[in-house]
């Protein structure tokens, strides 16, 4: 049986689990959690604040000596004040909070990673790398690894992941919602073919060990993923990614989807298993929660049921509620958390803006159990209430904090970056073994 066919029933079965939750509890201030971060985590866990007010903190990398590096988004159109490429943090007195904070470079964006003595940094159109030393801050200017990466318009987040063999996988998000002739316009048809797929909405592969590479459509590794802001190499060496589903099914196609609840619940957000040549369907298809499969997009003649354009597209490995906006993806490799968390993946969700009024989803972190690269049950809410406002008031403008990047420290604690309040959380397990 082909991989594509074998995943179809799995994706359908997972749909029934997509709204699942587990019981969680608020951590109270105590001797094991002196600076409570006021988010919800499971019983036995402690969420504390490692650093605060850093600006638009995006993704994280942590060195073997516990130094923390966080990318700072500085590529937004209309950006006025100059921002650093990244911030370097050190806890010199070992009290659980950063006390040395250094701002380095200029014009950061999203991705950041440590590999083989280098710090790799996404700077929008380029990915650079700094040679690391024993000091917190690199002593020499960066070298260019890849240049010419598409940035504007549309999705600018440039997450990347480096495999053990040096392969550099780079997300290049779509420039628009669904490749319409007029983006996000009422009943505007889709461009057919969607020519932007040659340079956007996919994952590109380069070599992290080589300098001065140029972006090239021929380097595309996988396509049809609208915006894969989270990527990770699993324990099995496999590349995994998540991707954002499209928006505005009801708003742009009310004659096909007259019930506003349809656009509220569709399409699902997705976790993907990525191999060379994979096509995940965007913009021609979206994952219908109701049909439990990929269906034709309305821009390409779809009615919410047809699958004419989707038979050869690869379905997701797991699905999650619509418009939650998945960001980072992390396989837990530490020893601090209970053993069950070493068999699955953590995903941050930034929170929604286009669910129904009064029913937006705030930022959260989920845990998806996996075994041998396959889901073994429903996802669980691991950390919640980052927004810090009542549920009916949740929206991006009101949220106080929104989780983005994840990283595991040498002691097994989980670090989380927040790009609204500029906070870095540190989550540890202090419960019974």
What are these regions (language model features)?
Residues 63-65, 114-116, 162-165, 233-236, ...:
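Residue-level detector of Asp-centered blade-edge/turn motifs that repeat once per structural unit
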Residues 21-41, 157, 174-216, 223-227, ...:
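Beta-propeller domain segments
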Residues 93-100, 136-137, 213:
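Acidic, glycine-anchored loop motifs typical of Ca2+
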Residues 67-71, 118-121, 167-171, 238-242, ...:
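Conserved beta-propeller blade signature
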Residues 50-54, 102-107, 145-152, 219-223, ...:
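Surface loop/turn motifs at the tips and blade-to-blade linkers of beta-strand repeat domains
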Residues 407-433:
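Blade-level signature of beta-propeller repeat domains, shared across WD40, Kelch, NHL, RCC1
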Residues 100, 109, 115, 125-163, ...:
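Asp-box/WD-like beta-propeller blade repeats and closely related beta-sheet repeat scaffolds
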Residues 60, 112, 160, 228-231, ...:
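Hydrophobic core register within WD40 beta-propeller blades
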């Amino acid at each position: 049986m082909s991989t594509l066919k074998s995943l179809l029933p799995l994706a359908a079965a997972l749909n029934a689990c997509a709204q699942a939750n587990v019981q969680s509890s608020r951590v109270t201030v105590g001797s094991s959690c002196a600076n409570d971060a006021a988010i919800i985590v499971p019983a036995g866990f402690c969420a504390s604040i490692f650093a605060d007010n850093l600006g638009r903190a995006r993704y994280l990398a942590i060195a073997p000596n516990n130094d923390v590096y966080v990318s700072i988004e500085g590529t937004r159109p209309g950006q006025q004040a100059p921002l650093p490429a990244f911030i370097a943090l050190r806890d010199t007195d070992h009290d659980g909070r950063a006390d040395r904070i250094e701002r380095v470079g200029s014009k950061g964006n999203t991705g950041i990673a440590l590999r083989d003595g280098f710090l790799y940094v996404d700077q929008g159109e380029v990915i650079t790398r700094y040679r690391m030393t024993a000091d917190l801050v690199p002593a020499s200017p960066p070298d260019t690894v890849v240049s010419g990466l598409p940035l504007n318009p549309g999705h600018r987040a440039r997450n990347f992941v480096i495999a053990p063999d040096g392969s550099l996988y780079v997300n290049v998000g779509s420039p628009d919602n669904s490749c319409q002739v007029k983006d996000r316009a009422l009943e505007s048809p889709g461009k057919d073919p969607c020519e932007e797929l040659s340079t956007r909405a996919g994952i590109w592969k380069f070599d992290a060990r080589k300098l001065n590479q140029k972006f090239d459509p021929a380097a595309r590794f996988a396509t049809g993923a609208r915006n894969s802001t989270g990527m990770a190499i699993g324990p099995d060496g496999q590349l995994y990614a998540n991707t954002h589903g499209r928006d505005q099914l009801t708003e742009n196609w009310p004659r096909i989807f007259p019930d506003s609840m349809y656009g509220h619940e569709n399409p699902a957000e997705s976790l993907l298993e990525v191999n060379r040549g994979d096509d995940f369907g965007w913009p021609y298809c979206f994952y219908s929660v109701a049909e439990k499969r990929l269906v034709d997009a309305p821009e390409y003649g779809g009615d919410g049921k047809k699958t004419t354009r989707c038979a050869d597209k690869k379905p997701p490995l797991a699905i999650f509620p619509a418009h939650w906006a998945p960001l980072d993806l992390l396989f837990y490799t530490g020893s601090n958390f209970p053993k069950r968390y070493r068999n699955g993946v953590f995903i941050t969700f930034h929170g929604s803006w286009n669910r129904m009024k009064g029913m937006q989803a705030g930022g959260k972190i989920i845990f998806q159990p996996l075994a041998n690269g396959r889901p073994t049950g429903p996802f669980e809410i691991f950390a919640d209430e980052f927004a810090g406002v009542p549920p009916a008031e949740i929206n991006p403008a009101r949220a106080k904090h929104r989780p983005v990047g994840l990283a595991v420290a040498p002691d097994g604690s989980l670090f989380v970056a927040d790009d609204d309040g500029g906070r870095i959380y540190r989550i540890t397990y202090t419960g019974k073994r």
